[in-house]
Amino acid sequence: MRILFLGAGGTGGYFGGRAAQAGADVTFLVREPRAARIREQGLRIKSPLGDATLQPQLVTQQTLQGSYDVVVLSCKAYDLASAIEAIRPAVGPDTAVLPIMNGVLQYDVLDREFEPHRVLGGLCQINATLGP
């Protein structure tokens, strides 16, 4: 199963990183400055459950190709419109879209964009920050 995480910040970086660490086929869709930083320093997770430094698969909006089985949205709600445009090339006819975002209003927007049967309900509870 191919999984695309939009965002590698506190939330997406943690859940996507842990999924990759467990052997899942995870790719992060990030902006170029974040991609450069991850390439240089790795994706670092510091947690009471164990620290990790990963070199995950990365794409930018310019290099994104092909569809994924699942696209996980881990952006802020105010970035939803640009997030939808960024992931559109990765959403094929059988792709599921899983938002793990703040708020619930995004479900109506995602249902209109990608069909309700493909938009999954997502909930996560985590205290995470993006650090140096």
Regions found by a protein language model. Name each.
Residues A52-P132:
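Rossmann-like NAD(P)(H) cofactor-binding subdomain of soluble oxidoreductases
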Residues T11-Q21, K46, L54, Y107, ...:
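Short, electropositive, low-hydrophobicity segments enriched in small/polar residues
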Residues M1-L43:
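NAD(P)+-binding Rossmann beta1-loop-alpha1 motif at the extreme N-terminus of oxidoreductases
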Residues D25-Y68:
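Conserved N-terminal Rossmann-fold NAD(P) cofactor-binding segment
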